[in-house]
Amino acid sequence: MLSLALPLTGMKLVSSLMRTVQSALIPARLQISGLPASEALSRFGMLSGMLMPVLMLPSFITCSLCMVAAPELTRRQANGTPQRSLVRRILGGTLLVGLCAMVGVWLFAPLIADTLYRQAELLPLLRRCCVLVPVMALSQVVSGLMNGLGLQGTSLRIALFANLLSVLLMYALAAQPTLQLWGAVIAMAAAQAVTLALSLRALYAAVR
């Protein structure tokens, strides 16, 4: 039991530490790019408080999928029943939810940016970053399925690698005057893509 709990605790610690690092690193690097301190903090607030919550909208559905699917996957693993077909159905459903949410973000981006948040600069962020919605949804579900198969240690190693990559890219890119906040977005997107790719590889290697 402890061997399962420790990696999960580690992942929560990594997530918390990453938020702390981002809250200090991104504004500091944006200032180096030439933005005043107040503007750098405002841009970071737009990223963390406006963009990210919208991109994570499907999480209330994907969390439910994880809660239902993970125990069934564990049961099939214990019984020696093939799991790959179940994994395909779950990921297919998740992808459909993510794609629908992506289209929704694209269509309603002007309403979200101009009416809800009253931030015109948020519109291009939403439009360009909406492709991350299905990636983030899939990452969340794949992580839940891996936990159901007892792959918490693998999930932790992937999270550590992806977060380290994200920090390094943010440090390098967010300070570029031609990128600024887009540098942080690129770093975040790269980390999400790497997380999904490595997690899918580990998941399919574990199921049959």
Sequence positions of predicted segments:
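Helix-loop junctions and terminal segments of transmembrane helices
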Residues: L55-N79
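C-terminal transmembrane helix end/exit motif
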Residues: S23, A189-R208
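Membrane-interface junctions at transmembrane-helix termini in multi-pass inner-membrane proteins
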Residues: V133-F161
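Short membrane-interface helical motifs at transmembrane helix boundaries
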Residues: C100-P124
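Helix-terminus/linker motif at the lipid-water interface of multi-pass membrane proteins
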Residues: L13-L57, A113-T115
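Membrane-interface helix-loop junctions in multi-pass transport and translocation proteins
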Residues: G150-G153, N163-A197
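Interhelical loop/hinge segments that connect adjacent transmembrane helices in multipass membrane
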Residues: M1-S15, A205-R208
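Junctions where cytoplasmic loops transition into the N-terminal start of transmembrane alpha-helices
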Residues: L4, L8-M11, F44-L51, S85-G98
